[in-house]
Curated annotation (Swiss-Prot):
The modification N6-(pyridoxal phosphate)lysine is found at K182. Its EC number is 2.6.1.87. Pfam families: DegT_DnrJ_EryC1 (PF01041). It is an enzyme of class 2 (transferase). It catalyses: UDP-4-amino-4-deoxy-beta-L-arabinose + 2-oxoglutarate = UDP-beta-L-threo-pentopyranos-4-ulose + L-glutamate. GO terms for molecular function: pyridoxal phosphate binding; UDP-4-amino-4-deoxy-L-arabinose aminotransferase. Pathway: Nucleotide-sugar biosynthesis; UDP-4-deoxy-4-formamido-beta-L-arabinose biosynthesis; UDP-4-deoxy-4-formamido-beta-L-arabinose from UDP-alpha-D-glucuronate: step 2/3; Bacterial outer membrane biogenesis; lipopolysaccharide biosynthesis. This is UDP-4-amino-4-deoxy-L-arabinose--oxoglutarate aminotransferase. Homodimer. One of its GO terms (biological process) is response to antibiotic. It comes from Pectobacterium atrosepticum (strain SCRI 1043 / ATCC BAA-672). Gene3D superfamilies: Aspartate Aminotransferase, domain 1, Type I PLP-dependent aspartate aminotransferase-like (Major domain). The gene is arnB.
Length: 382
């Protein structure tokens, strides 16, 4: 029987196991030296000015928007073609999410759509670097500067991505994810990076109860143990067990992303003759991290719906994903914004399918996926 091929699987080895064992033996397993080392290594690798490790990218988004003072009466512009957490956070803060359409072929938010949505209430713009490719930052930064609106990059898919020769995160404010399926992972975790020192300090406080320091800081830096709450905060700090794994993964990132690029290139070559539509890569200079390999299933061209094709692949022992169902089409937001219509987003939301892509895949795994797709699509055309 052929083994099941998931759409993603973390790449772990003896180095990660040894790193966790080292932390367990140290006696300090929560936020501590490994977390500090991870922040420093992230800055060194990507040219960031400030890096704040957090327990998830969602938590990072929460404290970043809070640090910007976003709340009731404010508006935040972001695409609907994104993971729900961003829009959830905006909503939970009492602000209004202003969801805009994306480019049909790349899924990148377009500067003209953002500009059309700007009002005097707009307090932040959150573009998404999608599937490992970067959004067009020159155009987005120009908007941010022209209107004086903070730009917060959702870089959950973009660790190791470059835009015009510059690492994502080297400038401005960006939020990365270390979730289990991301290019580097520590099971759960994230990193907020920024070149705004004052913003970084507010985020550091908010991610740990609103205190200015954490327990490790108080122990080693000689600060008063009676640390005071500056403003009410949360518990979004990253534990050293997770940070130790992330440090090893960060060191492996160049090899991880290189393998992802090889697998993606093999897919693109072999899928050329099938009626599936892979995402287009942006035409501006960039380095793609290939977090996800996505195709669009147009039922009129393929003779089968996206959902039925996913089910058929499952019978072949092949897993798939859906990244993502548009936020405004989901029950809560559909009822709250019944008249919102985003045609490019809605077409993609109904047709997107993520194929298996992870560094431990063999070339033969790509061949197997393409062979299964070919067989299924030929059978429905007969």
């Amino acid at each position: 029987m052929t083994d099941f091929l998931p759409f993603s699987r973390p790449t772990m080895g003896d180095e990660e196991i040894a790193a966790v064992a080292e932390v367990l033996r140290s006696g300090w397993i929560t936020t501590g030296p490994k977390c500090q080392q991870l922040e420093q290594a992230f800055c060194q690798q990507f040219g960031c000015q400030q890096a704040i490790a957090v327990s998830s990218a969602t938590g990072g988004m929460h404290v970043t928007l809070m640090a910007l003072g976003i709340g009731p009466g404010d508006e935040v512009i972001t695409p609907s073609q994104t993971w729900v957490s961003t829009v959830n956070i905006i909503t939970l803060l009492g602000a209004e999410p202003v969801m805009v359409d994306v480019d049909r072929h790349t899924l990148m938010v377009r500067s003209q759509d953002i500009e059309a949505a700007i009002t005097p209430k707009t307090k932040a713009i959150i573009p998404v670097h999608y599937a490992g490719a970067p959004a067009d930052l020159d155009a987005l930064r120009a908007l941010s500067e022209r209107y004086g609106i903070p730009l917060i990059e959702d870089a959950a898919h973009a660790v190791g991505t470059q835009y015009r020769g510059e690492w994502i995160g080297a400038r401005g404010t960006a939020i990365f994810s270390f979730h289990a399926i991301k290019n580097i992972t520590c099971a759960e975790g994230g990193m907020v990076v920024t070149d705004d020192e004052a913003l970084a300090e507010r985020i550091r406080s908010l991610k740990f109860h609103g205190l200015g320091v954490d327990a490790f800081d108080r122990q080693l830096q000689g600060r008063k143990p009676q640390a005071e709450v500056v403003t009410p905060g949360f518990k979004y700090n990253l534990a050293d067990i997770n940070a130790a794994i992330a440090l090893v993964q960060l060191d492996k990132l160049p090899a991880i992303n290189a393998r992802r690029q090889q697998l993606a290139a093999r897919y693109l070559t072999q899928l050329h003759s099938l009626p599936l539509q892979p995402l287009a890569v942006p035409d501006y200079p960039h380095l793609h991290a290939w977090h996800l390999f996505m195709v669009r299933v147009d039922e009129t061209q393929c003779g089968i719906s996206r959902d039925d094709l996913m089910a058929a692949l499952q019978t072949h022992g092949i897993g798939t994903g859906l990244h993502f169902r548009a936020v405004h089409t989901q029950k809560y937001y559909r009822e709250r914004y019944p008249h919102l219509h985003l045609p490019e987003t809605e077409w993609n939301s109904a047709s997107l399918m993520t194929l298996p892509l992870f560094p431990d895949m063999q070339d033969s795994d790509v061949d197997r996926v393409v062979a299964a797709l070919t067989s299924i699509l030929e059978s429905v055309r007969d």
